[in-house]
């Protein structure tokens, strides 16, 4: 049966009717339906949960004549199961009992109180501590795309107008959202295939006017001019859908989402999806974090600092003034050694950014308030450390940290030193904060003393030495007497419970005290919950300032981390130049040097207006790809304000970094290895400029030798002569080493190797000039190719080389070989090009068809 079909509800039991009605409202997610100490799932939800979570699938009787598939999880273990589900892109609606079973005549009243989706998480138990948790929405217009992202756990809201599908792919790669909303007629679904949390939304949720109203209501403004986004129509439509989705799932006010910013590609160095992937910035080719640039650079003290660092890595700046502000701050931190004390102070700060989001949503827990209290108490120490610094950017961050003495004092006075995890059982509000609460607690907590006194008094009054006064949750307070002595009890003793050898009684005095104590416990809990809610009201007026504090602390963390990395790893401050070029002396690959078992060989690179392309040759395993990647990574690091692994680096303006490195099939899109290679090459040739850094590795190897050589030659020639991009062009086509003789600005460099008998040693040092040979057979032998195969390959190689020598005298120069004649155009095609269909009569059109037939 389909649990969403509510047409025949009368066939079912009252409880199942209640369930089916709620499921119909949340048909696109799993429904956790609270029954006692369990959350139950039914029908298809039960089957899916059983499969995804590995829990037992059972049946719960029948409803409507059919067995009901059922699966359940204990309520106290729900967070662990939720974590598993959101990691695989599932959403869950949590339905709680809000009525009293004792007074309910039919099914207990229930209500969906919480919706958990991958992109709207704020609970720290469900979040990846050092990764942004982005919800995204994408909308396709007639021309271009609108893209919006929101991190509900921080309040960061960003939009982008993207002109091409390739730009959208790059943004998806950069932001890596955990949940994506897209419209019903979205035409680029192939870009979303590997994302888990995809949600198709109705077209009306992207309505422009509705979106504007939603955003204005959220920000409390009359218009959006102050955000500089009024012309971003498509991305505002995406933002509106996103905002509505968050309101529907959170079901509460969202005061921490108080601004929206626009991401402009012109402000940052453009990195397309292939470049981000090939350079392994924050994710390696296997999908993990090991051996990435982020893994090397990230020694941040806080999780919020780590997340900011990863955003910086994916958004290298173009504005030299902004970069220099960061560099100056890092340099001062390093020279004064203040980064050491800052690191320790920030480590104790915690993840204030996410704590503030939970506070804004009123889902913060007692320990969140305790952590906020600790963070505020550290502010004077932080400010003292910063007082030693004078760099303008650092001074500005110090001002943003702010001061919050009243809020700190409030939390010191209100919250106990080590609060419990949850408010529901009490014990969170400190004694002395509220006199009425202390009074109710005193009544409750004084029960033990009262019972001891009552027991002593009753023993003396009755003469029953074995008399005891006790309490249990079922029967409450009682006076216990052995059955043998029960005939000695006074007349005011009323029997409450009979046991095998004991009788339990209650007296009017004890009954009255019981009611008073139980009432005081309930009143104490209710008052404590009220005081807890009031704490939110007292802190929230400072929400914006506390968010500024969190952002400033995160940036200080990143900058002090850069200083520590520079000191520990031997990095130097790069020089930024206004002249186009990249000059690196003794550069090192930041990742490879950390994982290599042998000393890393540093290498230089020089690119400028008169030296725009390097043809890089050398053996496989010789280090060509490592060399090219290190140039790109050093350039990128310089543009995020980080010091770089080199003795010296001077880098001019860069608008884009392109890489065509490595090869793999794209099976999901039906593209072969060669097709992927050519698509990436086409993107580079179309979009590279004279200020771009281009890395091209082994172009043309996925097809026949002459096809591949022709493509590689033409691509290199186009980049050198038409585009003028700064290019490293690695190849095994030795014919390409003739390019420097044919055009200016092109130079050969190579990585060499030394042969000794049947072994080979790679030098990994870059030298001017072309390589002498490729050493392919030696590398194959190192890889373990059978000796018989290597021997046969050597024999075949000698045959081929001998044949080449025999025709040496008639050998055609490569430029002549590649200068193929232009194909002659078919006369029918020429005729078609000359036709103007608007000027033809029907008779002329028919005559023309016969003529075209003859010409073809």
UniProtKB/Swiss-Prot annotation:
SUPFAM superfamilies: DNA repair protein MutS, domain I (SSF55271), DNA repair protein MutS, domain II (SSF53150), DNA repair protein MutS, domain III (SSF48334), P-loop containing nucleoside triphosphate hydrolases (SSF52540)
GO MF annotation, one: ATP binding
Pfam families referenced in this protein's UniProt entry, alphabetically: MutS_I, MutS_II, MutS_III, MutS_IV, MutS_V
Keywords tagged on the record: ATP-binding, DNA damage, DNA repair, DNA-binding, Nucleotide-binding
SS bonds (residue pairs): none
Function: This protein is involved in the repair of mismatches in DNA. It is possible that it carries out the mismatch recognition step. This protein has a weak ATPase activity.
Family classification: Belongs to the DNA mismatch repair MutS family.
Name listed for the protein in its UniProt record: DNA mismatch repair protein MutS
């Amino acid at each position: 049966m389909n649990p969403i079909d509510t047409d025949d509800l009368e066939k079912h039991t009252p409880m199942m009717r209640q369930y089916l009605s709620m499921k119909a409202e949340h048909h696109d997610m799993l429904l956790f339906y609270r029954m006692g100490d369990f959350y139950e799932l039914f029908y298809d939800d039960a089957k899916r949960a059983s499969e995804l979570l590995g829990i037992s699938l059972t049946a719960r009787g029948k409803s409507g004549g059919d067995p009901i598939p059922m699966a359940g999880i204990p309520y106290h273990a729900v967070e662990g199961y939720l974590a598993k589900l959101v990691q695989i892109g599932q959403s869950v609606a949590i339905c709680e009992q809000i009525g009293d079973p004792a007074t309910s005549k039919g099914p207990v009243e229930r209500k969906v109180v919480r919706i958990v989706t991958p992109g709207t998480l704020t609970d720290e138990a469900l979040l990846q501590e050092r990764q942004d948790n982005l919800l995204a929405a994408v909308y396709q217009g007639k021309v271009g795309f609108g893209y919006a992202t929101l991190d509900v756990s921080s309040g960061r809201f960003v939009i982008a107008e993207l002109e091409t599908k390739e730009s959208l792919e790059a943004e998806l790669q950069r932001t890596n959202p955990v949940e994506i909303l897209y419209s019903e007629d979205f035409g680029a679904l192939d870009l979303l295939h590997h994302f888990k949390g995809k949600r198709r939304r109705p077209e009306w949720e992207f309505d422009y006017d509705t979106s504007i109203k939603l955003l204005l209501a959220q920000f409390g403004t009359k218009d959006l001019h102050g955000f500089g986004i009024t012309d971003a129509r498509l991305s505002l439509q995406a933002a509106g859908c996103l905002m509505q989705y968050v309101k529907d799932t959170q079901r509460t006010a969202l005061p921490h989402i108080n601004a929206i910013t626009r991401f402009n590609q012109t402000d940052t160095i453009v990195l397309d999806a292939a470049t981000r992937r090939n350079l392994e910035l924050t994710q390696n080719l296997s999908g993990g974090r090991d051996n990435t640039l982020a893994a090397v650079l990230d020694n941040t003290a806080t999780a919020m600092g780590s997340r900011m660092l990863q955003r910086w890595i994916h958004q290298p700046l173009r504005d030299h003034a902004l970069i220099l502000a960061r560099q100056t701050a890092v340099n001062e931190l390093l020279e004064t050694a203040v980064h050491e004390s800052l690191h320790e102070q920030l480590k104790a700060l915690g993840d204030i950014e996410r704590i503030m989001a939970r506070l804004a949503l009123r889902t913060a827990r007692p320990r969140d308030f305790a952590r906020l209290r600790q963070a505020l108490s550290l502010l004077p120490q932080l400010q003292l450390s910063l007082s030693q610094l004078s760099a303008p950017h650092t001074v500005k961050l110090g001002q943003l940290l702010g001061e919050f003495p009243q809020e700190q004092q409030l939390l010191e006075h209100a919250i106990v030193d080590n609060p419990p995890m949850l408010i529901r059982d009490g014990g969170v509000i400190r004694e002395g904060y509220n006199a009425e609460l202390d009074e109710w607690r005193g009544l409750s907590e004084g029960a033990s003393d009262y019972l001891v006194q009552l027991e002593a008094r009753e023993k003396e009054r009755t003469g029953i030495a074995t008399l005891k006064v006790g309490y249990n949750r079922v029967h409450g307070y009682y006076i216990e007497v052995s059955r043998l002595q029960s005939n000695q009890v006074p007349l005011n003793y009323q029997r409450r419970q009979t046991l095998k050898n004991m009788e339990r009684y209650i007296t009017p005095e004890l009954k009255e005290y019981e009611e008073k104590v139980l009432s005081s416990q309930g009143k104490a809990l209710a008052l404590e919950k009220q005081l807890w809610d009031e704490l939110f009201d007292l802190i929230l007026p400072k929400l914006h300032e506390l968010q500024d504090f969190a952002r400033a602390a995160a940036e200080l963390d990143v900058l002090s981390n850069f200083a520590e990395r520079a000191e520990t790893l031997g990095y130097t401050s790069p020089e930024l130049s206004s002249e186009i070029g990249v000059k690196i002396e003794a550069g090192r690959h930041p990742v490879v040097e950390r994982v290599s078992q042998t000393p890393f060989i540093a290498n230089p690179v020089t690119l400028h207006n008169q030296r725009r392309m390097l043809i890089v040759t050398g053996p496989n395993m010789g280090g060509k790809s490592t060399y090219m990647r290190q140039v790109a990574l050093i350039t990128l690091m310089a543009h995020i304000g980080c010091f770089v692994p080199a003795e010296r680096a001077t880098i001019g303006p860069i608008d884009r970094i392109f890489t065509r490195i490595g090869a793999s099939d794209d099976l999901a899109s039906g593209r072969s290895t060669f097709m992927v290679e050519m698509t990436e090459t086409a993107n580079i040739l179309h979009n590279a400029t004279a200020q771009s850094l281009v890395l091209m590795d082994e172009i043309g190897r996925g097809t026949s030798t002459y096809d591949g050589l022709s493509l590689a030659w033409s691509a290199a020639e186009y980049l050198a002569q038409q585009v003028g991009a700064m290019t490293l062009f690695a190849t095994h086509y030795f014919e390409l080493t003739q390019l420097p003789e044919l055009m200016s600005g092109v130079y050969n460099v190579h990585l060499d190797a030394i042969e000794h008998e049947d072994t080979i040693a790679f030098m990994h040092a870059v030298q001017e000039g072309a390589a002498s040979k490729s050493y392919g057979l030696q590398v194959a032998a190192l890889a373990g190719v059978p000796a018989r195969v290597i021997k046969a390959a050597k024999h075949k190689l000698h045959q081929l080389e001998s044949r080449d020598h025999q025709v040496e005298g008639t050998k055609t120069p490569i430029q002549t070989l590649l200068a193929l004649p232009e194909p002659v155009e078919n006369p029918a095609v020429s005729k078609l090009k000359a036709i103007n269909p608007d000027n033809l009569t029907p008779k002329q059109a028919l005559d023309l068809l016969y003529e075209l037939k003859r010409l073809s």
